[in-house]
A protein has these predicted regions:
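Extreme N-terminal leader/targeting segments of oxidoreductases
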Residues: 1-18, 36-37, 58, 393, ...
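N-terminal Rossmann-like FAD-binding beta1-loop-alpha1 element of flavoenzymes
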Residues: 16-42
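Glycine-rich FAD pyrophosphate-binding loop
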Residues: 35-59
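N-terminal glycine-rich dinucleotide-binding loop that anchors FAD/FMN and/or NAD(P) in oxidoreductases
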Residues: 56-83
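Conserved flavin/dinucleotide-binding core of flavoenzymes
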Residues: 57, 113-116, 344-442
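Mobile amphipathic helical/loop "lid" adjacent to a hydrophobic cofactor/ligand pocket
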Residues: 77-204, 211
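Helical element adjacent to the flavin cofactor pocket in flavoenzyme catalytic cores
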Residues: 212-270, 275
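Mid-domain catalytic core of redox enzymes
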Residues: 256-390
Length: 442
């Protein structure tokens, strides 16, 4: 039912009127592309733009100011082409980062890190006689080989059965006879940290889908990973640059309903006013998109409703006790296991932002921790956030393959859930959604 006051968006010329709902990377990229030849109105329910591009202005006790990212942190020059193009057009400056990961297990006392050479892998002499750990290192190589072998099987190959192509990570590991030690101390920490999911959920990820991501990012070899970078001054720099190109930015303006009318779309915002647009891009999480559609189709229910998200409580703080005790084992990403057989409900990972963003060494480290709320000293907490991340199951991956069925010439969907859930996936989906409703990035 269309109720409320109707209003048209003021045009600056004869340009089309286009709205983008949601200002994460997908919405910002769509808005940037569409702003080339359209008047764009950007709706954002929050008090700030950016979504996971979330930069905090921090002042230390000596009065020094730092910009610390807590959501989107790193990108690389190999697998982020859409985001890099956006940065280039905006004049965004980036800098090289330190990409490494550690695992610390409270149960057996294990601490090690990858990406830092031998001193990280063997931070203490005792690991040289730790049979389980040394066997795990050999299993890593075997895992890389078997994962690449699965990817090399054509999906229509007669040698490939539905069970091998559709198997979960947990099934893949069991069939490959990988040890529980390897699963607990290498595999689930890797997946859980990368996708911000709990370890049990990590084992339910579709193996082939997961391995395609790892291979794409050079993570199915001991070496060969791309060079990772961060935005100088924080990711807020690109957010501000995009915002300057948009005709109208509406913060604190949740969208309550989206109505489709053939060759136009109406939006009812928080003030109950109806506004008509030539086209709309919905760049929210899928469940939010489904909620604001006034007349969702059966297909939209099936597809958008099949994509779960995890909710992660996140803290920006200075409590270094969440990092490994051994300085040689400390890394940029630091995964914590309460016990060797632990399957915590939430991911427990800490990002050393001083290392990742190459902040000045002042004797105080700025850390972002997902999960582990009770582990962090209250007087060290600077800010608290909640982020949501897409989760991947055989069902959600199947639904993802149908997303293109939902788009039309006047309404398209965007979000990192169209891909692997990362900033490049969001940017690429924003570009494609903008093009679907008539935008051109030239």
């Amino acid at each position: 039912m269309n109720s409320g006051r109707r209003s048209s968006v003021k045009r600056s010329s004869d340009k089309r009127k286009v709205a983008v709902v949601g200002s994460g990377v997908a919405g910002l990229t769509a808005a940037w592309v569409l702003s080339k030849d359209s008047d764009v109105t950007l709706y954002e329910a929050d008090s700030r733009l950016g979504g996971h591009a979330d930069t905090h202005a921090v002042t230390d006790p000596e009065g020094r100011n730092f910009a610390v990212d807590t959501g989107f942190i790193v990108h690389n020059d190999r697998t982020y082409p859409t985001l890099l193009r956006l940065f280039a057009e905006l004049g965004v400056v980036t800098q090289e980062s330190d990409m490494s990961m550690s695992v610390r297990c409270e149960g057996c006392g294990l601490e090690y890190s990858g990406g830092q050479g031998l001193r990280g892998v063997l931070p203490t002499p005792g690991l040289l006689v730790n049979g389980s750990f040394l066997s795990m290192l050999m299993e890593v190589k075997r895992f890389h080989r078997r994962a690449r072998a699965l990817l090399e099987q054509p999906e229509d190959s007669t040698a490939s059965t539905a069970s091998t192509l559709d198997q979960t990570l947990g099934v893949f590991l069991r069939n490959g006879r990988f040890s529980d030690y390897f699963t607990a101390h290498f595999m689930t920490p890797l997946v859980s940290a990368v996708w911000s999911c709990d370890p049990s959920a990590a084992l339910e990820y579709p193996a082939r889908y997961l391995f395609a991501f790892l291979d794409h990012h050079g993570m199915l070899t001991i070496s060969g990973s791309p060079t990772w970078r961060t935005v100088t001054g924080g990711s807020v720099e690109y957010v501000k640059a995009v915002a300057q190109s948009i005709s109208a930015v509406r913060l604190n303006t949740p969208v309550h309903a989206v109505y489709r009318h053939g060759d136009s779309v109406e939006i009812r915002g928080g003030d109950d006013r109806l506004e008509t647009y030539d086209a709309v891009v919905i760049a929210t999480h899928p469940q939010q998109a489904l909620k604001i559609l006034a007349d969702p189709t059966a297909t939209e229910h099936e597809v958008l409703g099949a994509m779960p998200y995890s909710i992660n409580h996140t803290q920006l703080h200075t409590d270094e006790t969440v990092l490994p005790d051994n300085s040689n084992a400390r890394a940029s990403w630091n995964y914590y296991l309460p016990h060797c057989d632990a399957r915590p409900d939430h991911v427990l990972v800490s990002y050393d932002m001083t290392r990742l963003q190459r902040l000045p060494e002042t004797g105080r480290r700025y850390i972002v921790t997902l999960g582990g709320k009770d582990m962090i000293a209250a007087d060290s907490v600077i800010d608290q956030m909640t982020y949501e991340h897409p989760q991947y199951t055989p069902t959600s991956v199947a639904a993802q393959s149908r997303l293109s069925e939902l788009d039309s010439d006047v309404l398209a969907f965007a979000g990192a859930y169209h891909g692997w859930g990362f900033h490049e996936d969001g940017a690429l989906s924003g570009l494609r959604a903008a093009e679907r409703v008539g935008g051109r990035w030239q």
